[in-house]
Amino acid sequence: MTQSGGTNTGALWGGRFASGPAAAMAALSKSTHFDWALAPYDIRASKAHARVLHKAGLLSDADLDTMLAGLDGLAADVASGAFVPAETDEDVHGALERGLIDRVGAEVGGRLRAGRSRNDQVATLFRMWLRDGVRRVAAGVLDVVDALVEQAAAHPDAVMPGKTHLQAAQPVLLAHHLLAHAHPLLRDIERLRDFDKRAAVSPYGSGALAGSSLGLDPEAIAADLDFDAAAANSIDATSARDFAAEAAFVLAMIAVDLSRMAEEVIIWSTPEFGYVTLADAWSTGSSIMPQKKNPDVSELTRGKAGRLIGNLTGLLATLKAQPLAYNRDLQEDKEPVFDSVAQLELLLPAIAGLVGTLTFHTDRMAELAPAGFTLATDIAEWLVREGVPFRVAHEAAGACVRAAEARGVGLDALTDEEFAAIDPALTPRVREVLTVQGSIASRNAKGGTAGTRVAEQLAEVRAAAQQARAWIA
C-alpha cells in the first residue's frame, strides 16, 4: 500500500515506526480542516507552557525570548492567513510546531514539546475555545431577550388568547406571553454561566495521562490562561469530555427554546390567526406563488434545533463506551460542538431581528381573547369567592359553557335567569368578571398576568439581562 512521506512528516510522533502511515490512514487521521479553529488558543497556551518550562529550568532566558518572539510572529501569520496548515500536517498542533521551528529553528522550537502531550493540550484548548464560544452565543441570546423586552414594553395593555393544548384557555396580556419566552432564555444563560465554572479547570500539565516528571507548575499555567484552577486528576483531565456534552446540551436547549417561539410566530402569522405580520426583511417569497410571504427564519430555527439535538446525541454516543484515559474517538468531539456554536451564531441575529420587527395586530388578538369561553374559569373562581366549593363551582361554570354553546353566544350573553337556573349562587353580580379586562386584572398573584405583575416581570427580566451582559464582558 502507498505510504505517505516519512515516519514523522507533519505529525508529532513517528520515532518508533519504520515507515509512515498509509495514505488512507493519514487521510483518516487528519483533522486540520476543523481543529485549525484552535490555532490562536494553541499559540497562547504554548507561550504559557514556555514560561512554565523556563520557570522549571528547562528553557534558558535567551531561548524563552526567542521562543516567545517566534510564537508572536506565528500568531500574527495565523491571524493574517500567511501561515496555514500544509497538506502533510496531521493536526493543528503539528502544523504550529512546524511553523515555530521554521521561525526559530529545531534546537529551540523542538524544546516546546517537553512536558506536554496532545492529550492535555487539546483538552485545554477545547475548553478555552468553548468558554469563548458560549459567551458569543450568550450575547446573541441576550439580543433576543432584548427584542422580546422591547416588544413587551411597547404593548403593555394588549390582550390575547392564552392557550393550552393550542386551545383557548384564558385571556392574558401579550407582554406576559412575550416575557414567558424571555425567561427560559435567561435560564439558558444561567446554564452557560454554570457550565463555565466547570470548564474553567485546566488539564495542562497532565501529559498523556499520568502527569509530568519535569517539575512543571500546572497551577501557574492555569492562571496564565485564565482558568480558575488546574485539574485535580490527570487521567480525568485528559479523557473527560463531559464539559463538551454539557455545553452541547445547553446549546441544544437554547435552540429548542428558540424553536418553540419560532413555532408560535409561524402560527401567529397565518391568516387564520392573524396575530402578526412579518417584516419584509425577515421573510422570503415563493418562486411560483406571488402572494406568499414565508416565515423562513422561524422554519430554519425549527430545523436547526433538530440539528443541534443531533449534535448532542452524536457526541454522547461517541463518549458512552470509552475506557480511561484518552482514546482517538475523541477526535470526533469537536465538530459537533463547533457546529452548534456556529449555527447559533448564524441564527440568533436573525431571530432577534425577526422578533424586534414583528407587527402585532392587537385588535385581532383582543377580538379573539374571549373566544372559546376563556372566561369560564373566572366564573368558577367567582363562585369560590362566594363560598361555593370549587368542585361545585367547576361544574356550574361548565354548565354555563354548555348553555352558551347551545345558544351560539358568549358567556356574557347568558341572561340572569339562565345563570340562576344553572346555580342559584350565580347572581347578576357574576357579570363583574365576564370581561377580558376584569379577568386579567384579577390575576394579580406574583407571576400572574395582571398589568402590575407583568410590569414587575418586565423590570426583573431587564435587570437579569443587564447582569448577564456584565458576565459576557
UniProtKB/Swiss-Prot annotation:
Which CDD domains does the UniProt entry name for this protein? Argininosuccinate_lyase
Superkingdom of the source?
Bacteria
- Localization (cell): Cytoplasm
Query: Enzyme group, top EC level?
Result: lyase
Q: Name one GO molecular function term.
A: argininosuccinate lyase activity
Kindly give the InterPro entries that the UniProt entry links to this protein.
Answer: Arg_succ_lyase_C, Argininosuccinate_lyase, Fumarase/histidase_N, Fumarate_lyase_CS, Fumarate_lyase_fam, Fumarate_lyase_N, L-Aspartase-like
The EC number of this protein is 4.3.2.1
Q: Any idea which UniProt keywords this protein has?
A: Amino-acid biosynthesis, Arginine biosynthesis, Cytoplasm, Lyase
Provide GO CC annotations from the record.
cytosol
Catalytic activity annotation? 2-(N(omega)-L-arginino)succinate = fumarate + L-arginine
- Main localization is cytoplasm
Metabolic or biological pathway:
Amino-acid biosynthesis; L-arginine biosynthesis; L-arginine from L-ornithine and carbamoyl phosphate: step 3/3
An example GO biological process term is:
L-arginine biosynthetic process
Cite the Pfam families for this sequence: ASL_C2, Lyase_1
HAMAP family (alphabetical): Arg_succ_lyase
Q: Its family?
A: Belongs to the lyase 1 family. Argininosuccinate lyase subfamily.
Q: What is this protein called?
A: Argininosuccinate lyase
